[in-house]
């Protein structure tokens, strides 16, 4: 189904890329590309879905075939009928404001009949277990729900191949389990899956093979059983998350009573009629690390953005050093680093980004 033969690609004005990639993925197989950040995983997925070099300019050699077709001879829309892509940040591929419209959009874009659009949209939403969210605005979906919405929009087009780039990057444990179930169902239905992922534990029951990339080349191939038998030190040395249960650092035996530099009092947030969280009162001790955890959609990101003054609360107060602090004051005192760091960059180079 997927055939890369001596495929090499180097990005324009960069030394990054992949060299001499030859791989074959059979119909209905699930293959995972894994390795350290920057090893070439994403670039291989871009060769398969045609984004490189059509969208990402660079020098390409070799061949890429999908279902026997040389994609260099296909137009972008023709590749899109064969290969569906799900990106690390699903927001980057949304075109509609509500879920049903988002799932229908690819079918509309390809000019399918109104009847077929409705049938495919309803079938995709049901298959991805999103019926209860059908009319929900996509901007208030949890990360896991957004990922499933992105998969549903691809599913509606019935491609032969699904390409997923780091699909669990923004998912919690529950969202990851849900995604694993979704991909397993797709595989059972005969779809071919190619994933780029460095978290391998959740894929052990889905993947048929793992291809380990290093410096833009395929360095090794493993079955799930091969990886289970590798010493944990070897897996960590490869830059991968262990397929075994993780270990936590020990908690301090004594918790000292440090003064609270930041507090919330009765904090509540609603978006339209949706209650994101209600009556949250937290103290953040000076010089300590406080972790806010919970499932996708619990309100963690919204709370962080409110603390930093990037969005407003519905009710309640935030205090810095015991004094109420308005949003403008918080923006001067508290800094925010989101899960998609690319949205915080304003310049084209590291040096320019760091300049005041």
PLM regions: where:
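The feature captures the beta-strand-to-loop junction immediately N-terminal to the Walker
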Residues: 34-36, 293-295
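H-loop/switch region of ABC-family ATPase nucleotide-binding domains
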Residues: 197-198
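Conserved ABC transporter NBD signature motif
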Residues: 57-69, 316-330
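Conserved ABC ATPase "signature" region
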Residues: 115-133
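Catalytic Walker B motif of ABC-type/P-loop ATPase nucleotide-binding domains
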Residues: 162-165
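Helix-to-loop junction immediately C-terminal to a conserved catalytic motif
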Residues: 49, 308
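Conserved ABC ATPase signature
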Residues: 137-141, 145
């Amino acid at each position: 189904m997927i055939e890369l033969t001596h495929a090499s690609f180097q990005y324009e004005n960069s030394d990054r890329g992949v060299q001499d990639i030859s791989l074959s993925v059979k119909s209905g197989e699930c293959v995972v590309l894994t390795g350290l950040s920057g090893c070439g995983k994403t670039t291989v997925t871009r060769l398969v879905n045609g984004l490189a070099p059509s969208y990402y300019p660079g020098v390409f050699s070799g061949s890429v075939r999908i279902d026997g077709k040389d994609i260099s001879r296909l137009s972008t829309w023709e590749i899109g009928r064969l290969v569906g892509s799900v990106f690390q940040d699903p927001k980057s591929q949304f075109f509609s404001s509500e879920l049903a419209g988002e799932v229908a959009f690819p079918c509309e874009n390809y000019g399918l009949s109104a009847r077929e659009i409705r049938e495919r949209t309803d079938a995709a939403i049901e298959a991805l277990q999103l019926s209860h969210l059908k009319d929900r605005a996509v901007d208030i979906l949890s990360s896991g729900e957004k990922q499933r919405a992105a998969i549903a929009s691809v599913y509606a087009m019935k491609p032969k191949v699904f390409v997923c780039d780091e699909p669990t990057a923004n998912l919690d444990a529950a969202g990851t389990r849900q995604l694993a179930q979704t991909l397993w169902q797709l595989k059972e239905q005969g779809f071919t899956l190619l994933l780029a992922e460095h978290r391998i534990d959740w894929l052990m029951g889905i993947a048929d093979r793992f291809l380990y990339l290093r410096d833009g080349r395929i360095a090794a191939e493993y079955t799930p059983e091969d990886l289970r038998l590798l010493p944990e030190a070897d897996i960590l040395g490869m830059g991968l998350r262990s397929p075994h249960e993780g270990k936590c650092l020990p908690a301090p035996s004594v918790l000292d009573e440090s003064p609270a530099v930041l507090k919330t009092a009765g904090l509540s947030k609603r978006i339209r009629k949706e209650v994101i969280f209600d009556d949250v009162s937290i103290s953040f001790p000076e010089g300590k690390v406080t972790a806010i955890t919970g499932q996708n959609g619990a309100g963690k990101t919204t709370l962080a953005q409110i603390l930093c003054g990037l969005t407003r609360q519905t009710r309640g107060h935030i205090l810095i050093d015991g004094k109420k602090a308005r949003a403008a004051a918080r923006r001067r005192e508290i800094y925010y680093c989101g899960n998609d760091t690319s949205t915080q960059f304003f310049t084209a180079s590291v040096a320019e980004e760091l300049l005041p």
